[in-house]
């Protein structure tokens, strides 16, 4: 009975809505009202369910991104924020960009396209940069007037013109003489003022003599020495002809003297046939 009392308020509330609160539940799930009619005791379908959640309120209408009749904004490609942070320079030869990140401590960097050097810093004190027509970057003294390209296929002499150093410059202007090579007829600078007037041309890499005095003197000395040895060998041969037949070691002495005479005469021929390079101006 206690259980029926606990359930009664629920039934009475459902019945009060349709029969005034005095009806009883029948076996078919219906309650009998005062007038004898059957009234449904169960609530209508959907009455016991929770109400569906309401939708979110609509967003307030704002201005459109592009107004009618207005051009869209210009296109800008998305780039990485680090793409423009790396320091770049332009190659002085092929105009290609060169990334110098991590190379700022160097004076020059090498281009990855043309493999030529491009300076990124000023030259060291007392030096300057010079670019050869073959695109080779050279570094030389600020007082240099002529330099030679070190590349084997170039070997070009670059005339830098007169340089007037300041009064505080500790490096004197190089002294020398312009010489026309006796082999290739090119002009180069000769700066070795010694008794040996032999010079190697930077163009053809051949040795020649500056003037005729040095090779002529060497030729005369070698010729006279060779002539003296030849006369000595002849006299030795005639003087020791009979003893040489008994002692075979005398033939070795003949051969040694004759060999010295041939070497001296050959050296005299070398100096006599040496090419001569002529200077085009006096020593400065």
From Swiss-Prot:
Segments of this protein annotated with the region Disordered: 1-82
TM regions (residue ranges): 219-239, 246-266
Segments carrying motif CX5R motif: 140-146
Membrane topology: Multi-pass membrane protein
Subcellular location: Late endosome membrane; Lysosome membrane; Cytoplasmic vesicle, Phagosome membrane; Cell membrane
Claim: Mitochondrion is one of the keywords in the record: no
MF GO annotations: phosphatidylinositol-4,5-bisphosphate 4-phosphatase activity
Annotated InterPro entries: PtdIns-P2-Ptase
Active site positions: 140
Catalytic activity as recorded in UniProt: a 1,2-diacyl-sn-glycero-3-phospho-(1D-myo-inositol-4,5-bisphosphate) + H2O = a 1,2-diacyl-sn-glycero-3-phospho-(1D-myo-inositol-5-phosphate) + phosphate
UniProt entry keywords in alphabetical sequence: Cell membrane, Cytoplasmic vesicle, Endosome, Hydrolase, Lipid metabolism, Lysosome, Membrane, Phosphoprotein, Transmembrane, Transmembrane helix
One GO cellular component, as annotated: lysosomal membrane
EC number(s) from the headed UniProt entry: 3.1.3.78
Positions where Phosphoserine occurs in the chain: 169
Keyword Lipid metabolism: yes
GO biological process terms held by the UniProt record: cholesterol metabolic process; lysosome localization; phosphatidylinositol dephosphorylation; positive regulation of TORC1 signaling; proton-transporting V-type ATPase complex assembly; response to sterol depletion
Amino acid composition bias (Gly residues), ranges on this chain: 15-38
Subcellular location, principal: membrane
Enzyme class: hydrolase
Protein role: Catalyzes the hydrolysis of phosphatidylinositol-4,5-bisphosphate (PtdIns-4,5-P2) to phosphatidylinositol-4-phosphate (PtdIns-4-P). Does not hydrolyze phosphatidylinositol 3,4,5-trisphosphate, phosphatidylinositol 3,4-bisphosphate, inositol 3,5-bisphosphate, inositol 3,4-bisphosphate, phosphatidylinositol 5-monophosphate, phosphatidylinositol 4-monophosphate and phosphatidylinositol 3-monophosphate. Regulates lysosomal positioning by recruiting JIP4 to lysosomal membranes, thus inducing retrograde transport of lysosomes along microtubules.
Summary of subunit composition and partner proteins: Interacts (via transmembrane domain) with ATP6V0D1. Interacts with LAMTOR1, RRAGA and RRAGC.
Name by which UniProt lists this protein: Type 1 phosphatidylinositol 4,5-bisphosphate 4-phosphatase
Organism the protein comes from: Rattus norvegicus
Upper lineage: Eukaryota, Metazoa, Chordata, Craniata, Vertebrata
């Amino acid at each position: 009975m206690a259980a029926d009392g606990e359930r009664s308020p629920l039934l009475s509330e459902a019945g009060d809505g349709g029969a005034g609160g005095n009806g009883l539940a029948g076996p078919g799930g219906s309650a009998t009202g005062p007038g004898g009619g059957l009234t449904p005791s169960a609530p209508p379908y959907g009455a016991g369910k929770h109400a569906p959640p309401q939708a979110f309120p609509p967003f307030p209408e704002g201005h459109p991104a592009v107004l009618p009749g207005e051009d869209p904004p210009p296109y800008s490609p998305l780039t990485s924020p680090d793409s423009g942070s790396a320091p770049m320079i332009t190659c002085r030869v092929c105009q290609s960009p060169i990334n110098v990140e991590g190379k700022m401590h160097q004076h020059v960097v090498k281009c990855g396209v043309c493999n030529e050097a491009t300076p990124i810093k000023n030259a060291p004190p007392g030096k300057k940069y010079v670019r050869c027509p073959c695109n080779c970057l050279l570094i030389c003294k600020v007082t240099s007037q002529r330099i030679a390209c070190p590349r084997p296929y170039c070997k070009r002499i670059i005339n830098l013109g007169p340089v007037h150093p300041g009064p505080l410059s500790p490096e004197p202007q190089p002294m020398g003489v312009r010489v026309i090579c006796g082999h290739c007829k090119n002009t180069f600078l000769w700066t070795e003022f010694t008794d040996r007037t032999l010079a190697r041309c930077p163009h053809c890499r051949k040795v020649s003599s500056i003037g005729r005095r040095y090779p002529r003197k060497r030729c005369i000395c070698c010729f006279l020495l060779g002539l003296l040895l030849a006369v000595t060998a002849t006299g030795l041969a005639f003087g020791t002809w009979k003893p040489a037949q008994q002692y075979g070691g005398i033939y070795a002495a003949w051969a040694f003297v004759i060999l010295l005479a041939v070497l001296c005469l050959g050296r005299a021929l070398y100096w006599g046939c040496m090419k001569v390079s002529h200077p085009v101006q006096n020593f400065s």
